């Protein structure tokens, strides 16, 4: 099936490999975002470098959807691993996405749920299946599960313990996916999150992140490129 694929990464390092693979790319710079609209391996692709954090990701995702009209969204990049089976370089694939820093439980909502939105944003099952298949084919260790987002870099035992208490099944944490998922939900556009682990979230995760971000970017980009071949 020929689809146009929207790909979103927060940082330049997370989209650089994909950007270098693009041909016939038109560049759109708007509101602090960079959008590259072209092709990778004969697949129509719109690649967004959104900037870091949920607001930047939401702004960028909405602009990407409006300006380039992709059929589906893949969120790529790095994440902090909380699942015991995840190590640096491994792949995490979303089965659900939630905000970990939203709290309107005083009004009867679930932790992480925002009014007029579901508690969890569910990715497209076909996209999840394609991601799992390509990860297995590439030989990466992968975990599929809950990815939680917040406007905080998670390191330190206290933060980790709080997130695990609120979301016992959390596999990984990062800073954009829930915002991207929420915008996709609003626009009724299918999505999936496919990220590689740059750090195992602990008190030294900020040091690990700097060291292993290039590996995470490489591995997550490899899976995204493999996924594209399913839609050419």
Swiss-Prot record:
GO-annotated biological processes: L-methionine salvage from methylthioadenosine; L-methionine salvage from S-adenosylmethionine; nucleoside catabolic process
Pfam families per the UniProt record, alphabetical: PNP_UDP_1
Cellular compartments per GO CC: cytosol
EC number, as in UniProt: 3.2.2.9
Active-site residue numbers: 14 (proton acceptor), 199 (proton donor)
InterPro entries membership: MTA_SAH_Nsdase (IPR010049), Nucleoside_phosphorylase_d (IPR000845), Nucleoside_phosphorylase_sf (IPR035994)
Pathway info: Amino-acid biosynthesis; L-methionine biosynthesis via salvage pathway; S-methyl-5-thio-alpha-D-ribose 1-phosphate from S-methyl-5'-thioadenosine (hydrolase route): step 1/2
Statement: the UniProt record of this protein carries the keyword Hydrolase: yes
Keywords: Amino-acid biosynthesis, Hydrolase, Methionine biosynthesis
GO molecular function: adenosylhomocysteine nucleosidase activity; methylthioadenosine nucleosidase activity
Cell membrane among keywords: no
Reactions catalysed according to its record: S-adenosyl-L-homocysteine + H2O = S-(5-deoxy-D-ribos-5-yl)-L-homocysteine + adenine; S-methyl-5'-thioadenosine + H2O = 5-(methylsulfanyl)-D-ribose + adenine; 5'-deoxyadenosine + H2O = 5-deoxy-D-ribose + adenine
Amino-acid positions noted as binding substrate in the UniProt annotation, renumbered to this chain: 80, 154, 175-176
HAMAP family according to UniProt: Salvage_MtnN
The protein's role, per its UniProt record: Catalyzes the irreversible cleavage of the glycosidic bond in both 5'-methylthioadenosine (MTA) and S-adenosylhomocysteine (SAH/AdoHcy) to adenine and the corresponding thioribose, 5'-methylthioribose and S-ribosylhomocysteine, respectively. Also cleaves 5'-deoxyadenosine, a toxic by-product of radical S-adenosylmethionine (SAM) enzymes, into 5-deoxyribose and adenine.
PANTHER family on file: 5'-METHYLTHIOADENOSINE/S-ADENOSYLHOMOCYSTEINE NUCLEOSIDASE, 5'-METHYLTHIOADENOSINE_S-ADENOSYLHOMOCYSTEINE NUCLEOSIDASE
Family membership: Belongs to the PNP/UDP phosphorylase family. MtnN subfamily.
Protein name: 5'-methylthioadenosine/S-adenosylhomocysteine nucleosidase
Organism expressing this protein natively: Actinobacillus pleuropneumoniae serotype 5b (strain L20)
């Amino acid at each position: 099936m020929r689809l146009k694929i929207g790909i979103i990464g927060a940082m330049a390092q997370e989209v650089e490999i994909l950007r270098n693979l693009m041909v016939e790319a038109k560049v759109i710079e708007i509101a602090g975002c960079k959008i590259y609209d072209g092709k990778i391996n004969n697949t129509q692709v719109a690649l967004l470098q959104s900037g870091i954090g949920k607001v930047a990701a939401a702004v960028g995702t909405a602009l990407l959807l409006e300006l380039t009209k992709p059929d589906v969204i893949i969120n790529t990049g790095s994440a902090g691993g909380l699942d015991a089976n995840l190590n640096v370089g491994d792949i995490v694939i979303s089965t659900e996405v939630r905000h970990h820093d939203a709290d309107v439980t005083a009004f009867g909502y679930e932790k992480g749920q925002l009014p007029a939105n579901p508690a969890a944003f569910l990715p497209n099952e076909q996209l999840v299946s394609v991601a799992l298949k390509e990860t297995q084919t590439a030989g990466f260790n992968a975990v599929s599960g809950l990815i939680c987002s917040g406007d905080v870099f998670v390191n330190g035992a206290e933060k980790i313990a709080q997130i695990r208490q609120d979301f016992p099944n959390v596999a990984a944490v990062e800073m954009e996916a829930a915002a991207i998922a929420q915008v996709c939900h609003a626009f009724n556009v299918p999505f999936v999150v496919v990220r590689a682990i740059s750090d195992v979230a602990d008190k030294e995760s900020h040091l690990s992140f700097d060291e292993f971000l290039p590996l995470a970017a490489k591995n997550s980009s490899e899976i995204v490129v493999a996924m594209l071949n399913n839609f050419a």
